[in-house]
């Protein structure tokens, strides 16, 4: 039976104190980098339990530590979208961070808008040269069949939000979302604690996976509190054409108005507030409204909008990490990552 290697054995080999070796192995205290590396290298060589199966200090370790660079003939990171992404869209700041993270790869990020015809015919944008493309990041690409076509390209691919995935085969790509459930449920709980009983949802739950998750979080919350009356007055018109007018017509037909609305995003919430005002209701005096995204407009809209904050910087950092590691290791299992969100209480919920 092999003799168990101890910290004292390593200390004896290196003629160092046991305390110094312990600091290096447990990553505690202050040590010179050279000393720490020498100890860890010796621990790996001797087969110490934490390092026996880890090739941390192989001769080619220096090679693996070298910065990863894209091949010279594939330096383009392509961003695909079906929409014009204004500075108000959460992805604006996210993409700034994403681009900053990939700059060291000597790559260029190009933006390609998918036209309605290209979307329908499942064709790539004419501006995109797939032969020069190292990876693709998709934002606002919510057509499932088109997304499947992109997955079949055999190009490293990341979706920031996706089409609704309920009861569908998963996309063969990495997926990045903001956390959609926890803070929606906290928003509902806040409304219930403040005496609101009829709580409804506004927004097209089938627009994208995030909207669907927000709706399901809302539904689970009202069912948990036993307040299901609000389910009958949800305002969920589908489609994007003339949405404010469609939303107005939807709520105008309600015989009973909710006490509060949870909305799919801030822009739905702002359209809803305007529609309620036109119908003679005051927010928050008569009806409370909560959005999602914490867009720039949310803080200066009248009334200032309670919303759920998306951390664009961490989304940008995570997006870069997911896509770059996919380019480096194409055989990795597909990953689904959620980043933290936070409820921000403002005037539209009486705060």
What kind of region is each of these model predictions?
Residues 248-351:
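Flexible loop/turn connectors
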Residues 174-202, 241-249, 269, 310-328:
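Hydrophobic alpha-helical segments within soluble ligand-binding/sensing domains
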């Amino acid at each position: 039976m092999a003799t168990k290697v101890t910290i004292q054995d390593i200390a004896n080999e290196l003629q160092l104190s046991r305390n110094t070796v312990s600091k290096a192995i447990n990553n505690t205290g202050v040590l010179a980098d050279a000393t720490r590396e020498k100890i860890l290298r010796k621990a790996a060589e001797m087969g110490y339990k934490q390092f026996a199966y880890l090739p941390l200090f192989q001769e080619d370790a220096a090679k693996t530590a070298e910065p990863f660079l894209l091949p010279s003939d594939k330096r383009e990171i392509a961003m695909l979208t079906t929409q014009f992404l204004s500075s108000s869209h959460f992805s604006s700041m996210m993409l700034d961070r994403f681009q900053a993270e990939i700059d060291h790869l000597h790559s260029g990020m190009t933006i390609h808008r998918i036209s309605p015809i290209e979307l329908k015919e499942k064709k790539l944008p004419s501006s995109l040269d797939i032969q020069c493309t190292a990876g693709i990041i998709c934002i606002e690409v919510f057509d499932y069949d088109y997304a499947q076509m992109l997955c079949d390209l055999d190009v490293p691919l990341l979706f920031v939000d996706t089409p609704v995935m309920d009861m569908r085969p998963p996309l063969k790509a990495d997926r990045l979302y903001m956390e959609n459930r926890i803070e929606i449920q906290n928003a509902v709980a806040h409304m219930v604690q403040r005496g609101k009983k009829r709580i409804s949802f506004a927004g097209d739950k089938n627009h994208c996976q995030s909207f669907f998750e927000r709706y399901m979080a809302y539904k689970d919350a009202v069912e948990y509190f036993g307040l299901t009356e609000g389910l009958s007055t949800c305002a969920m018109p589908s489609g994007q054409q003339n949405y404010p007018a469609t939303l107005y017509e939807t709520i105008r037909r309600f015989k009973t108005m909710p006490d509060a609305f949870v909305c799919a995003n801030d822009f739905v919430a702002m359209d809803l507030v305007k529609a309620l005002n036109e119908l003679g209701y005051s927010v928050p005096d008569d009806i409370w409204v909560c959005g999602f995204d914490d867009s720039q407009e949310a803080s200066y809209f009248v009334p200032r909008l309670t919303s759920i904050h998306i951390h664009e910087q961490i989304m940008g950092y995570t997006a870069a990490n997911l896509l770059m590691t996919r380019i480096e290791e194409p055989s990795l299992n597909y990953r689904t990552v959620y980043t933290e969100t936070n409820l921000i209480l403002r005037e539209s919920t009486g705060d």
